[in-house]
Amino acid sequence: MSVPTIREVRAYVVRGGGGDYHDQQGTHWIDDHIATPMSKYPAYRQSRRTFGINVLGTLVVEVEASDGTVGFAVTTGGEPAAWIVEKHLARFIEGAKITDIELMWDQMYRSTLYYGRKGLVVNTISGVDLALWDLLAKWRKEPVYHLLGGAVRDELQFYATGARPDLAKEMGFIGGKMALHHGPAEGEEGLRKNLDILNDMRNKVGKDFWLMQDCWMALDVEYATRFSTIAWNEMGLKWTEEALPPDDYWGYAALKKNAPKGHLITTGEHEATRWGFKMLLDMECCDIIQPDVGWCGGITELIKITALADAAGVLVVPHGSSVYSYHFVITRHNSPFAEFLMMHPVPDQVVPMFTPLLLDEPVPVNGRLKLDDTPGFGVRLNPECKLSRPYTH
């Protein structure tokens, strides 16, 4: 059987909920008063939309093979990412065999080194890479996780990220993660409020339910150490997540060293590539790494990242990303559970992360999920969502 080549790659954008989960209306819990690197400025403290967290929007990448098979994926990137796909990366994709994913990844990454390496460019490469895996699996009429070695467990179990861990417990999740509301610039009063919120939630969920805190790069080492110590000793906080800016490897190493025994330090949501994660691992920055498969380099790179972590004895619990992480986590021994982002505006319902952009997107039931054998990542684009193609080549 001859292997098809790639006829065309296309990049689309769409606004609203979908690949860029930040792109929500102001009443959504994800746009509440949440600590961020911009919290030092009062004008940008109340809402993440005020400093532009939603400016990029969603990127949808389609790759069509010479036999008519189409793979697609969604990630964050919007029009700037669409331009990169159409004007730069397309030359490495079109005409290539659909099986040559490793070659295409290497060419995309090397060709963008002078203006890429992380951030938007690697988001874009990730989107293309995921679309290529979707295409290959559809051509083979298999789910992506079969191509990655097959499932090592019967089902996935999840913790929930959202504003209401107490509701997550009722829904059967193994734990709940909340966003931190106040950063160092809000002083002792802000610290007390953070601890009061956590203590209130601990009283609601009981002592045995996992509680975690997402700090979204907002803290410094001193504040993070103090918060983590009190939160662990008094409220049994399981982990402190992404406390520091992602480039502060030295700070993370100090935080992990200073954290109380038994409390976990986690990070990696905004890290990218095997080289970035190698820094985290070599410097012993954390107990769990949390790469986002739509931002770190795609499946192709996540395979390498996870191998490094496995050799270092560090767990891998990918950040969100729905089916794109589910198909990976189910195949890895050092990924014992997964994250589910509660994307309902008031997180009292389990809804698909990429709603309404994707159809057939599975969600956990009682905190658990079995993957089926639908080819590719098992999802379809919703034809009612208006995609636009701002650039062509």
From Swiss-Prot:
- Chain positions of site Increases basicity of active site His: D292
Pfam family of the protein (one): MR_MLE_C
The entry's substrate-binding residues are: H22, R48, E339
Site residues by UniProt (Transition state stabilizer): E339
Catalytic activity reads: L-rhamnonate = 2-dehydro-3-deoxy-L-rhamnonate + H2O
- Output the InterPro entries linked to this UniProt entry: Enolase-like_C_sf, Enolase-like_N, Enolase_C-like, L-Rhamnon_dehydrat, Mandel_Rmase/mucon_lact_enz_CS, Mandelate_racemase_N_dom, RHMD-like
What residue stretch is flagged as signal peptide?
none
- Cystine links in this protein are none
> Where on the tree of life does the source sit, at the highest rank?
Bacteria
Q: What class of enzyme is it?
A: lyase
Name the cofactor(s) required for activity, per the record.
Answer: Mg(2+)
| Keywords annotated in UniProt | Lyase, Magnesium, Metal-binding
Q: Which PROSITE patterns match?
A: MR_MLE_1 (PS00908)
Q: Check the record and name the SUPFAM superfamilies matching this protein.
A: Enolase C-terminal domain-like, Enolase N-terminal domain-like
> What does the record note about the cofactor?
Binds 1 Mg(2+) ion per subunit.
Query: What NCBIfam families would the database entry show?
Result: PRK15440.1
Q: How does it assemble?
A: Homooctamer; tetramer of dimers.
The family annotation for this protein states:
Belongs to the mandelate racemase/muconate lactonizing enzyme family. RhamD subfamily.
Name this protein carries in UniProt: L-rhamnonate dehydratase
Q: Which organism is it from?
A: Azorhizobium caulinodans (strain ATCC 43989 / DSM 5975 / JCM 20966 / LMG 6465 / NBRC 14845 / NCIMB 13405 / ORS 571)
Q: Which gene encodes it?
A: rhmD
